[in-house]
Amino acid sequence: MKILFVLISILYAVYCFSSEEDVDGAYLANELEPVEDINSEQYAALEPKEEQERSCAGMGQDCKDDCDCCLNIATCDCWFGRYFCSCTFGDYQTCLRKKGKCKRNRPQSCPRSNLNRKKG
């Protein structure tokens, strides 16, 4: 069964290479005309639109402080002090801090985890 599979694979590879050479040879001899797309003008962009700046940064994007990050619990984490800053996941305390400090992207509510609550 394996030998049959290898034999079929070799025959298929030879067929692909030989048919490709025929098409390339015919194209070089101008026997085939290049295909022209009649709808190419329809899909051409008239003017590239400029990307508008977002009001907040998503997870993993660059930031300057916690208020730049979109999520309520997202914090701006920096390497080496104030260099290479990006938004990462924070916690409930981060949300409370953002609620008091931020004027833009202020959290409306801070989600609490049900993991640490005592029942009873």
Swiss-Prot record:
- Is Cytoplasm included in the keywords of this UniProt record? no
Keyword Magnesium tagged: no
| Cystines in this chain | 56-70, 63-76, 69-87, 78-85
Tissue specificity note: Expressed by the venom gland.
Q: Which residues form the propeptide?
A: 17-54
Q: What is known of its domains?
A: The presence of a 'disulfide through disulfide kOR' structurally defines this protein as a knottin.
Protein name, as recorded:
U13-lycotoxin-Ls1b
Origin organism is Lycosa singoriensis
